[in-house]
Amino acid sequence: MAGLGRLDPGPRTVMPAWKREILERRRAKLAALSGGQGSGAAPDGPNERLVLAESLGPLSQNPFMRLESERRRGTRPAQQLLELYCRVPGVRTIRADNILIIESAPGFPPAVPPAAGIRAAEVVVYEAPQPGRVSRLLEKFDSPAAPCRRGSPERFRPALPQLPVASASAATRTPTNRSLAPASPVRLSQPAPPISPVPVAQRAGQRSACCEPAHPDGTAGPGARRSDFLQKTGSNSFTVHPRGLPRSAVNRSLSNGPMTQESPTGPANGLSGSPPVPGKWKPKVESKEPSLHPPPSPGTPSATSVGPPAFPAPSPASATPSQRQWVSSATSANDSFEIRPSSKPDMETIPIGDLQARALANLRVNSRNSFVLIPKRKAPGNYPLAGRQFEEPKGEVGWASQSQGLGSQLVSTVDGAPALEKSPLAAEMQWAVRKGACPRPAISDTDKCVRWQRPASPPPFLPATAEAEPAEGLGVPGLAKNGQEPVRPGLPVTFIDEVDSEEEAFQEAKLPSSAVGVPSQYHLHPARPGHTSELLNRGSNTFTVVPKRKPGTLQEPHLSQTNGQSQQGAEEQDAESLSGPHTTLENTLKKRYPTVHEIEVIGGYLALQKSCLIKAGSSRKKMKISFNDKSLHTTFEYPSESSLAQEEAEEEEEEEGEEDGEEEEVGPDSEKPFTVFLPRATFVSSVGPESSSGLSSYTPKHSMAFSKWQEQTLVQTPTDVELPPKEVMLTPASQNDLSDFRSEPALYF
């Protein structure tokens, strides 16, 4: 091989003429481009060899690469940028080799803000923070439709040239979002309330995804207002619309069931002052494919209009904006919850009988990436209603791992809800009526409150709690429904595993078994016992599996009343918190596939000893053919005379016409049976005809018409089976026999 290596240069010098010509052209072109370095274009061999060697050398020395780098240097667009930005006050530019950094000068006094407002129909804010692992995981399966929600009011606004806002300083962004100035010409309804100071650290993601304290002046909390004009268009991008559009006013009255503008909560709603943004969001979301994400519970501010919004749109209040679509913004810069790696569950603490909990634990143990989303507690006073909405989404996303807090939380929710019960219900109803599209029956906050109250009462059905608690520890959705409550001390903790859908499916599968008639979580309508499917159809081929709430409170309905209304209430809570009206809509309009009863997920990565797909039917019998050297003569048996005699009657008619002469030729009684078969040996398995398989009564088919042979085998087999066979040895057939063997004890195999 070394010799070959040494010879390598030789072939290069003797390269074919066509290759040499190509090289010459290339070099000539290079020379012309590089400014007259064409002297090297001589076609002599050594030069060409050098060119080839050079082209195979390091990239930095590659003539083509050199040429390209020189060409790029000539244009120097970065230089123009530098010069341009150097003249901008308050902007500092730093130039590295291939990087140009333009940032606001730290010490530079901020420019005097224009009339406290942005004069644009839409402002696009881009945010750069890298999404966390969970965000990336979720976005990987996120539907791309997120940016434009169908029917979202924003879509219908005049699209003015968007103003990308440099994300250089969060402070700048924040004011932008916060204070679409009252002066802004677009604002139609009410001047923006005084801009509430927002910490610079707060990010757009937070702005869009978390509840913010309501304005002290009673105007809608920044969160509510923000959702009014903030639309998330990407993992870290938002489109900002001026607040105060008429739609907001309309939505305000209708959409925020709990937070109706009139709601006594007043500023706390953060919705009263400004149009209930959540409602607007909801319409967007609603119009959007209902099932895109597990709708944040209707209670979320975005979903505040309890009735229509199928998903709480990524309203600020939504603790976990619909987990899939807005997750990155929510997780990357969100003060509503924090993400921690989840600890591995302790299998010893799980009761052996709790199969679901153990399967979930096993799943989590084997999961490569498991995270816990822990909601951060906020002062409920800021947005009593919003808080509840905020919580609901969490319920949707999170697995309530703290059922104990449920009672108090429920109570608080109930207390906060009474005001909502009246107006929100009516508003919701109106909203639903106007929004004919929103299938979800207006589930008034009152209803929710009532439902919550029910669970608040000590759950009599706690038998399931034993099972539920371990599961909750593992991230079994516990009080997710309850999560809809206003922010409560015990917030549900969400576990996100890389394979969470399997867990969810498993839980769902298990729950249906526990409660046969339990309505699916998804209906927001009084759950119908028939709907057990936990699958939320998110698009044409995507199904989101939302785990059924398994906490004792929820299970009470499941266990006590399979079909009862109480079950309905609990399930409805489930549905609301988990899916929202969208799911309901989908349930009513689309065929759910598959239903929960059809899905049984036993564990994500659990290795099953036996596949559950194996079809072991009595009809499928294996035919085992074995040859024992010591008893070969018993391997091939002929049916006994009596069995053949019985068959004869049946088969004579079929085979009479065929080979009559042959049948008569057979003389001995022992061979008479073969007349039926047209003197052919029948091979019977050694076990006897009972095991009649394909070979139990075999007649060489090449010797008779195929149709006859088919009929014969069909008829023979059943009769053969009835009587024990008679052992016979096989001897070579005589000339006049059609079969290859006859039964005369002469030849042993």
Curated annotation (Swiss-Prot):
GO aspect biological process, one term: sensory perception of sound
Tissue specificity as recorded in UniProt: In the organ of Corti, expressed in the inner ear hair cell stereocilia and the supporting cells (at protein level). Expressed in the sensory epithelia of the organ of Corti and vestibular end organs and, to a lesser extent, in Reisner's membrane and the spiral ligament (at protein level). At postnatal day 2, expression is detected in cochlea, liver, brain, kidney, heart and lung.
Signal peptide residue numbers: none
Superkingdom, taxonomy of origin: Eukaryota
Sequence ranges of Polar residues compositional bias: 169-179, 230-239, 250-266, 323-335, 534-544, 558-570
GO cellular component, one term: cytoplasm
Biased composition (Basic and acidic residues): 337-347
UniProt KW Oxidoreductase keyword: no
GO molecular function, one term: protein phosphatase binding
InterPro entries: Phostensin/Taperin_N_dom, Phostensin/Taperin_PP1-bd_dom, PPP1R18/Tprn
Modified residues (Phosphoserine): S274, S401, S457, S501
Major place of residence: other
Subcellular location: Cell projection, Stereocilium; Cell projection, Microvillus; Nucleus, Nucleoplasm; Cytoplasm
Protein keywords: Actin-binding, Cell projection, Cytoplasm, Hearing, Nucleus, Phosphoprotein, Protein phosphatase inhibitor
Region of interest called Disordered, as start-end residue ranges on this chain: 144-348, 502-586, 636-673, 730-749
Ranges annotated as biased composition (Acidic residues): 647-668
Function: Essential for hearing. Required for maintenance of stereocilia on both inner and outer hair cells. Necessary for the integrity of the stereociliary rootlet. May act as an actin cytoskeleton regulator involved in the regulation of actin dynamics at the pointed end in hair cells. Forms rings at the base of stereocilia and binds actin filaments in the stereocilia which may stabilize the stereocilia. Acts as a strong inhibitor of PPP1CA phosphatase activity. Recruited to sites of DNA damage and may play a role in DNA damage repair.
Additional detail: Reducing Tprn expression corrects stereocilium morphological defects and partially restores hearing in Grxcr2 mutant mice.
Family: Belongs to the taperin family.
Oligomer and partners: Interacts with GRXCR2; the interaction restricts TPRN to the stereocilum basal region. Interacts with actin ACTB; the interaction may stabilize stereocilia. Interacts with CLIC5. Interacts with PTPRQ. TPRN, CLIC5 and PTPQR form concentric rings at the base of stereocilia and may form a complex. Interacts with phosphatase PPP1CA; the interaction results in inhibition of PPP1CA phosphatase activity. Interacts with DNA damage response proteins XRCC6/KU70, XRCC5/KU80, PARP1, TOP1 and TOP2A; these interactions recruit TPRN to sites of DNA damage where it may play a role in DNA repair.
Annotated protein name in UniProt: Taperin
Name of the gene: Tprn
